[in-house]
Amino acid sequence: MVVLKQEEVPECLRYLPRNYNFETGKVLRTIRRLGAKRVTLQFPDGLLRYSFVIMDVIEKYTGAECILLNDVVYGGCCIDDESIASDLLVHYGHSCLVPVGEMSTKVLYIFVDIRIDIDHAAEMIRRNFQGKIGVIGTIQFNSSINRLKRVLDEERGGVECTLPQIRPLSSGEVLGCTAPKIEGVSAVISIGDGRFHLEGAMIRNPHLRFYKYCPFSRRMTQESYDHSTMLSDRKSEIRKAFSGRSFGVILGSLGRQGNRSILRSVVDRLKEYDVYLIMLDEISPKKLERYNFIDSFVQISCPRLSIDWGKLFKKPLLTPFEVFYSGGEYLMDYYSREGSGEWKNYR
């Protein structure tokens, strides 16, 4: 086994962006501590381009065999600890949605913290906002969000910053399926370049104004979401589904998306209907067309699949929350440990 020398680290990692923290030293130390001989790596698409650099470093400095998992990774829910026998799985780019103690192998989460220009972000906020605001983002920007809060809070009488939280997520962290109810702020600013996770917070908080600060383009934009159309569409699908005679209940098998506890709750709720249990890795209109004898479906994988793409399916495709929904607020608490609900991963 080759021993890593400090002076060699910059040369080995020169192809990785300097503001992305892949915590390579931590990964190497963990492999050595465990004596791991086979290591599997899992990356979301946005980080996949850097995977082979990291694999080369691991193999060179530990002698471990590296295997790159090829299945698509939408989020921390897609962590795949069961597909291949290995001594360690390193999952990049997401927070710990599934506790490591529940895994079938040793797992190391690497958030891939992204450093941004805090001063520019703070100046953009000072120029455009007053009073109390909320700041949110994904785990990759979480440390930057906390630094941004400290910078803004240092100026008394200016903008007051709060980091909303829904446990077990970190303060300020949101997911496309899990976001807190935010109160007492005039606006919410999301730090990041995409909309998917921001939309989770927007769906949960239709009463608030949302903005996005992109640290790469250094632009601030106001974001909107058509809550009324979304809610109308989903209520219509719920009515159609419960007017039928049968349900196909799909347990997602992509990583850890499926939850058997939710499955049991959904099946019990639908006991007056004919229920067919189905297991699928990825759900698509074409795959469900094969089940022409089933009137409607419930998918236990990703709630946003139904919310965002439900219209592409010929038959209603409900989320677990919608099976129990009786009106009122549309919750986004799929991975929340707060409150109760038979549609949630944690109760």
UniProtKB/Swiss-Prot annotation:
Compartments where located: Cytoplasm
Record flagged with keyword Isomerase: no
Residue sites binding [4Fe-4S] cluster per the record: 77, 177, 302
Source species, domain of life: Eukaryota
Any GO MF annotation of the entry: 4 iron, 4 sulfur cluster binding
Main subcellular location of this protein, as a coarse class: cytoplasm
GO BP term, pick one: protein histidyl modification to diphthamide
Keywords noted in UniProt: Cytoplasm, Iron, Iron-sulfur, Metal-binding, S-adenosyl-L-methionine, Transferase
Keyword Acyltransferase attributed: no
Cofactors named for this entry: [4Fe-4S] cluster
GO cellular component: 2-(3-amino-3-carboxypropyl)histidine synthase complex; cytoplasm
Catalysed reactions listed for this entry: L-histidyl-[translation elongation factor 2] + S-adenosyl-L-methionine = 2-[(3S)-amino-3-carboxypropyl]-L-histidyl-[translation elongation factor 2] + S-methyl-5'-thioadenosine + H(+)
Name of the top EC class for this enzyme: transferase
EC number: 2.5.1.108
Annotated pathway: Protein modification; peptidyl-diphthamide biosynthesis
InterPro entries attached to this UniProt entry: DPH1/DPH2, DPH1/DPH2_1, DPH1/DPH2_2, DPH1/DPH2_3, DPH1/DPH2_euk_archaea
Cofactor note text: Binds 1 [4Fe-4S] cluster per subunit. The cluster is coordinated with 3 cysteines and an exchangeable S-adenosyl-L-methionine.
Family of this protein: Belongs to the DPH1/DPH2 family. DPH1 subfamily.
Subunit structure: Component of the 2-(3-amino-3-carboxypropyl)histidine synthase complex composed of DPH1, DPH2, DPH3 and a NADH-dependent reductase, predominantly CBR1.
The protein's role, per its UniProt record: Catalyzes the first step of diphthamide biosynthesis, a post-translational modification of histidine which occurs in elongation factor 2. DPH1 and DPH2 transfer a 3-amino-3-carboxypropyl (ACP) group from S-adenosyl-L-methionine (SAM) to a histidine residue, the reaction is assisted by a reduction system comprising DPH3 and a NADH-dependent reductase, predominantly CBR1.
Protein name as it appears in the record: 2-(3-amino-3-carboxypropyl)histidine synthase subunit 1
Record organism: Encephalitozoon cuniculi (strain GB-M1) (Microsporidian parasite)
